Amino acid sequence: MAVTLVTSFASSSSRFHFRSFSSSPSSLSSCFVRFQFPSRLRLAFAVTPLYSSSRAMAHTISHATLGLTQANSVDHPKISFSGKEIDVTEWKGDILAVGVTEKDMAKDVNSKFENPILKKLDAHLGGLLADVSSEEDFSGKPGQSTVLRLPGLGSKRVGLIGLGKSASTPSAFQSLGEAVAAAAKASQASSVAVVLASSESVSNESKLCSASAIASGTVLGLFEDSRYKSESKKPSLKSVDIIGFGSGPELEKKLKYAEHVSYGVIFGKELVNSPANVLTPAVLAEEALNLASMYSDVMTANILNEEQCKELKMGSYLAVAAASANPPHFIHLIYKPSSGPVKTKLALVGKGLTFDSGGYNIKTGPGCLIELMKFDMGGSAAVLGAAKAIGQIKPPGVEVHFIVAACENMISGTGMRPGDVLTASNGKTIEVNNTDAEGRLTLADALVYACNQGVDKVVDLATLTGACIIALGTSMAGIYTPSDKLAKEVIAASERSGEKLWRMPMEESYWEMMKSGVADMVNTGGRAGGSITAALFLKQFVSEDVEWMHIDMAGPVWNEKKKAATGFGVATLVEWVQNHSSS
């Protein structure tokens, strides 16, 4: 008896037909599936994106996932930031948060503060601030904070937040913002003011960046990803006044910039936090399409399906995707300013493995972290998070291509095997000696594609090697580039954003380890210098006339203490793009 099943999935832009045939119930082994796709794949499933165009921060995924899991809808509160120049004793609100160094906490022989700001506050509080800070053993060390309910000021509470020896870097001011957010959450405060006890330590030139870092830290500190929990708390903080850092349109613009970047970071965090049974390659592609829809005045999207990737001869990328029941989706977002000339074309390429089992070289044993391999798309999350922020900021004079070869690395009879030889889209051949070194195989074709867009510079980001974690730990990413100029640009951007990068060598002699007897190269070169040989591999797929950098972010993509994604890379990428704009 013949069996025929026809199922259709429709979207606003296309219709998909999945037709299965079997000659009889007893010959299911001969069953095959025919896929009929339109020329451009727009939707693979019925999906409600993480971000709805009607609400800037709406997070719902409605999808028949394994486990029937759906993300709860979460609306993140909007915080109003403003710069003010007022007497701290006159500010009215819930918490007056004072950032203090260890030096600021010094007291005279009468146990009174020597710092002018603390002395003024203590005078209005009848000496209680000095007394209580001593009782609390608060000394201004980093990580220390205390919130006191003391009568005598316009604010309901006074918070002291330790800055350590000094506060002069963006990361220090971001930490101050995070501490402010923690205090606000604990007290359910709706209004907070932030002031430094010693603002003279901040130069006039750096006040804008410092205020921006405080704002960013506050937004990120308030964020909790509760989409997959049965209960969640909604932060009550509505407004933050930053005192002593200036005021006016220039500061307001910088604070708004920080807000846009922060929500891009949050988007990146949520993508990485999403489990692999929810965030498939199709859903990741839909998130990219939704960004293009949200910022349609400056952004367009092109999602390539498997057949289109075959036409482009992406044999390396498609080999990785071959074992998965979830088809690959090649994502290409393009940002173009709505007006004015384009002076620079950039490409941001992110590794997009929504799950990595390791393939036939399956991840086994302690430390393999297979349960965390949802974060193997951290590079793509950084790229799409940057796209979200750039869509909001709209920098003039620069065109940006956001590229992700999204897929899963699974195990099946159709999957790539150790020993297989793959042909990338630039014609180079690769002998697979480890199926768990798959990220570089997807990036190979993505880099070729990026260079073919006529860009001047390419930066790729990937959770690529454990070797980089061994070398640098989990607090910083390694950068690899032949270009000293590009290295300086990206490092400068990271310093302003507060993210840590360290330049690693591109030791060309190590390429000997990557040679194959049957192909142009192998995909791994052994344990020694593993992150360097990975970068040398990627270099083979970059045009000589394009400046290129690889960022290995395997370490800082995940915060094990918080058991959550960090959103690493977004802020640096946005800052780097902004530095190329004509604004």
UniProtKB/Swiss-Prot annotation:
PROSITE patterns: CYTOSOL_AP (PS00631). The active site is at residues 363, 440. Coiled coil: none annotated. Gene3D superfamilies: Leucine Aminopeptidase, subunit E, domain 1, Zn peptidases. The keyword Ligase does not apply. GO terms for cellular component: chloroplast; chloroplast stroma; plasma membrane; vacuole. Binds 2 Mn(2+) ions per subunit. Residues 1-70 form a transit peptide. It is found in: Plastid, Chloroplast. Keywords: Aminopeptidase, Chaperone, Chloroplast, Hydrolase, Manganese, Metal-binding, Plastid, Protease, Stress response, Transit peptide. Mn(2+) 1 binds at residues 351, 356, 376, 438. Presumably involved in the processing and regular turnover of intracellular proteins. Catalyzes the removal of unsubstituted N-terminal amino acids from various peptides. Possesses leucine aminopeptidase activity against the model substrate leucine-amido methyl coumarin. Does not seem to possess Cys-Gly dipeptidase activity. Functions as a molecular chaperone to protect proteins from heat-induced damage. Belongs to the peptidase M17 family. Homohexamer (dimer of homotrimers). This is Leucine aminopeptidase 2, chloroplastic. It comes from Arabidopsis thaliana (Mouse-ear cress). The gene is LAP2.
